C-alpha cells in the first residue's frame, strides 16, 4: 500500500490536521468549526453563496452570518453530527480521497472516555467504510516525532493540556495528569483582561481577533511578580495592535497575564495544579528507575507551548520544586539532575508529524491495523489492538 493511501488525521479541539503517511507537514490544517446560516436570504449579504453548512476557515470570513458551533470541547467530541461534517470536509474536500481504499490513523487525547474512541471507530467503518483504522494516544505520537520512545510529554493544544509519562512507547494512564486550561481558555481570559482595560470586546465576534493578538504578543514571564511590577512602573511592555476595523489598541501587562493561567489555573477559576506542578508530580509518581530519564526528556508539544519564555519558566519552576521537595534545599544535589526541556520549533503540529511517521512505518504491517473484517467479526472488542480498550 503506498503512502498516499494511508490518511493521518489529528482532530484537535481547535484545528484538524490531516494529510498522508510519511509526510513532513499536514496537507491541510483547518479550524474545527461548523457554521449554519442564521438567515436564509434569497440574495446573500455578500457575493459568497451560503451553502447549508460551512466548515473550517470559511466560517471565519462569514462569521457574522453564521451560528458557529465547535464540535470538540476539551478534546472530547460533543456533537457527532458536526464532527461528521468536519470529517466529510477533511476527506472529500481537503484530501480528496476515497475512504474505502485507504487506511486511517486517528489520534486521541489521553484519559479520554472509551465511548469516544468506540464511536470514532464505528463512524470510520460504518460511515466512511475505511479499509483499516488505528487510534493512538497523542502523547506517544509527539515522542515518535522527536525520535524518542521514553519521555514526559507536555501537550497543550486548544482545549486541553496533559502531561503524560511514556516509557518504551507505552503511556501510563493512571499517572497521566490533565488540565482543562489551554489555548481557547487563554484567549477567553485575554478577552476579559482587555475588557477590563476598557476595550469593548465580544466573546464570540472578536474571539478570532483576540486569538491573533495572543499569538503575536503574548509571552510567559520568567518571574511574574517582577514582570508585573515592571508593567506598572514603566511602559516598556506596552505594544500596539491594529484591529481589523482600523482601531489601534494598546496591550501591556495582559501580554503575560493571559498565558500565566497555564501555570496558575486559579486565575481563571479552574481548580488544580498548573503545568509545572503537573509535570513535577507526574515524574515523582513514576517508579524511581525511570525518573531520571524522564527529567532528561521533557518534550513540549502543541500550539499552546509556543509562547516565548515558556521553556525557561518551566525549567525554573521544576528546578525550584526539585530543590524544595526532593533535595530539601540542598543545592549540591542539583548538579546531578540533568533537566532537559525539548522545545522543537515545529511542535505545533507535532502529534500529526508523529502520526505520519508511525503510519509510514506501519503502512504495510497488516497486524498493526484494525481491518474492516475484524471490526465486522468482533465489533468494538477490536479496540484492544490500540492497546487501551
Curated annotation (Swiss-Prot):
| Role noted for this protein | Functions as ATP-binding component of the Arp2/3 complex which is involved in regulation of actin polymerization and together with an activating nucleation-promoting factor (NPF) mediates the formation of branched actin networks. Seems to contact the pointed end of the daughter actin filament. Regulates the directionality of cell expansion by regulating the actin organization, and thus the microtubules distribution and the fusion of small vacuoles.
Q: What protein is this chain from?
A: Actin-related protein 2
Q: Which residues bind ATP?
A: 157-159, 211-215, 302-307
Q: Which UniProt keywords apply?
A: Actin-binding, ATP-binding, Cytoplasm, Cytoskeleton, Developmental protein, Nucleotide-binding
Give the CC-aspect GO terms. cytoplasm; cytoskeleton
**Pfam family for this entry, one:** Actin
Q: Which SMART domains match?
A: ACTIN (SM00268)
The signal peptide annotation in the UniProt record is none
In its UniProt record, a GO molecular function of this protein is: ATP binding
What protein family does this chain belong to?
Belongs to the actin family. ARP2 subfamily.
Q: Where is it mainly found?
A: cytoplasm
Under the heading SUPFAM superfamilies, the entry gives: Actin-like ATPase domain
Assembly and interaction partners: Component of the Arp2/3 complex.
Where does it reside? Cytoplasm, Cytoskeleton
* Iron keyword on record: no
**InterPro entries, sorted:** Actin (IPR004000), ATPase_NBD (IPR043129)
